[in-house]
Amino acid sequence: MAKKQTEGYMSAKESRRISKENRKITNQFEKQRKRKNVPESEYLTTMHDPQNAVEFDNLHTYFFTDTGTVKSVDGVTFDVPIGKTVGVVGESGCGKSVTSLSLMQLIQRPQGQIVEGEIRLNLGNGKAYDIVKTPQEQMQHLRGNYVSMIFQEPMTSLNPVFR
């Protein structure tokens, strides 16, 4: 009798084990993110160059799935100077959108998490926030007021009636 080929397949038991481990990891990140009344000093930072609007420094954004961890963004570093346009170019699936969504803290949670690095946002009043450490409560204030995004399908996001 021929032996069943299992190479490339994962058992249900292994999938449950990975899923349980990943849930523990994501729960820790979510607990940190959802804290209330966090003192500003915990996410206040300084820009490496005050002429930058945003600084990505060694950003790692991972997705914790039932079958393992997907390292979607793994060590990205770049700056966006104030008043300048920066194009992020790469192959399909290389992490361009996930990098931008990380800045907005809009990655799919709880599976998607920023696990390492800094994203420094210059607020223009001598203050800068490390977006990675900024709690959800504060991010709601920052989105739209200090940072915004036009998504990949602009026709579904932009209304030509509003100028």
Predicted feature descriptions by range:
Residues 1-163:
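ABC transporter nucleotide-binding domains
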